[in-house]
Amino acid sequence: MGLISKLAWRNIFRQKRRTILTVMTMTGGFVLSSLSIGWMDGSYSGMILFFTNHQTGQVQVHKDGYLDNPSIYDTIDNYNSVGEQISNQDNVRSWAPRIYVGALLASRDEGVSDGIYSNSAAAAVIGIDPVMEENATDFSEQIIEGEMLTVSEADSSLRATGQILLGKQLAVMLNASVGDSLVLFSQAADGSGADRKYAVRGIVSTGNNEVDRTTCYLTLADTQLLFALENRVHEIAVMTTSLREVDKVAAEISLATDSVGLSTASWKIFAKEFYAGMKADETQLKIMLAIIIGVAALGVLNTILMMVLERRREFGVMKAIGTKPKSIVRMIVLEANVMGLVSVLLGSVLSTIGLLILSEHGMILDPPMDYGGFVFREMVASITPACYWIPALSVMITSSVVSLIPALKAAHTDAAKSLRTV
């Protein structure tokens, strides 16, 4: 250890109160930055997973042009073959086929004569494969009353009563509950009438009020038969093994299916409004993070500047005995860096404790937060490398940069004037 390093080390412990204050300031900045990053990453990851798992999927495959202008005629033909191609791609966890059509639903209140419908509502009909949808999105967790759809003989007989799931608000509009009957009126892809009687099997709450007010669900087989879409679907929703793999998986699927006239999009594209809103909020949080780091930097600057003013006589003696200005600068910067390193180590321990608590227990939102049409009742933090390296880098750079100003001031101290300082 050189002379300058020894002097820097001794100076750190010479004024313990000042050193503790500086370390506490930098540690506080580290902890606040780390918790903010963990909270931001965890919250947004949770939002994305909730959004994609409960409704959209993380990657979607459609007929070219369908996403911009949906039509009952723009279908994915022989979808099972396309699904096999998708399954063969790396990092694909599961996929689920879907059909999207529009219809009018009508129900009658108790005591109303046959043929007279007292309640009606336009609805988006989504045809799903019960087993594949459950594997992809845990759809049954959204059913708050009744049971999940099942594949039955009724799916292949339009004369039999089918089974239907209603969105929570849609059920209220139709005054329908589990076990009640209603009628669906629409038009099939071949121009024929698509009318059928259904029994309400369950009520669905996705967390998105708009979806729950306008959507009902049929089995895929039933929807294909009713709307003359045999072996065809409008969408294949894909779930990946990790959110980090979404863009890569979308690119690989696009390469594999582009030759058959299909387009592939990640959730960032088909849910661009949700993504844009999330990025705007993320920018605000980054600004807040910069403010936290800036406040900590000002605290460190103030402390080190006071330290330099208190040690003017010491620096005057050093200049008088021939110490070079750059050596004084190096000593002060080294002192700040050592305190910064201690702050990083201490801050890492405290941040880990805080992040573990927030990731395990999270925070209950009361009242719940409405974001992008979805209602979130709980937020949790996540522990990622960014929770440590960003605050650590910020603290070390800050301690080096803000210490330069006082260090340069000390290095250019007039020895004669400083020696006359009491």
Where are these regions (language model features)?
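Mechanotransmission and gating elements of multispan inner-membrane complexes involved in transport
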Residues: Q187-L285, I292
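Hydrophobic alpha-helical transmembrane segments of multi-pass inner-membrane transport and secretion
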Residues: K16-S43, K279-E314, N337-V349, I397-V401
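Alpha-helical transmembrane segments
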Residues: V31-V59, L355-H361
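Short helix-loop junctions at transmembrane helix boundaries
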Residues: L345-I390, H412
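Short, membrane-interfacial amphipathic segments enriched in basic
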Residues: M1-K6, T264
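C-terminal membrane-exit region of the final transmembrane helix in multipass inner-membrane proteins
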Residues: I383-V422
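A structural signal for hydrophobic secondary-structure junctions
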Residues: D64, D74-N231
